[in-house]
């Protein structure tokens, strides 16, 4: 095993635990160290945290805490939903942000669920026609909501809105101020525990982004560690539930988390076919992403070179 002197120092960003569980497990189980890495996890406010204010979910995505941290060099690598990373890689540099390339399809395949207010009378997706669904704009809950509802509604019938963090959304549902909202864990389990109806749910894959300062061998070592962590989580998720339920601050115990929703896989190269399919889908909605990007301009699978 490498000694402390030989370990390469890496700073990674983590916000919502369910999307970065493989990173947290790899750190705490010593898997990064086994790969010669000294990984520092930098926590940023996420929409799943009870004590997060609305700055983490503001509509101006490049002003959110994660973006500010990355732009100032606080971290060199982060993960978002696949569509969010495409948007960051394409639009970020156009907006004068620190450049970031897509470097992998990530480990987390997080579940998102559309949950209805008990007062709404909504029990099926078709009833969400022209009804605003609360999401984090331009993040996984937004894109996955569009994907899910496309099977039941026309694009022009799908409406989304920003109603704050997931805790704030749940309380707005409870008060009847919203008809529906989209959540990831632990908030899907919290909603189930409290009797809210779940309309539909789907997995949503993360993608990994990195600055040019992160070299291929370092990324490869990170991804090997995360692949091993994914195996451990899938084999026995219970011991790791606490990372996720901590964000709910007492509203959900680790044994109450619906761990069957957790799914992780080894990071893999981001293929041309995957990029083209994802990018073309995003271009089908106004203002989701800027046209004109190419696979060569936004993807760098340097970890596999």
What kind of feature is each model-predicted range?
Residues 83, 160-161, 165-247:
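Pocket-lining segment of extracytoplasmic ligand-binding domains
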Residues 2-153, 179, 199:
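Short, glycine-/small- and polar/acidic-enriched structural segments
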Residues 216-289:
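Secondary-structure end/capping motifs
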Residues 22, 28, 66, 168-169, ...:
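Residues within well-ordered alpha-helices
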Residues 42-43, 48-49, 85-87, 189-190, ...:
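Short secondary-structure capping/turn micro-motifs that flank functional sites
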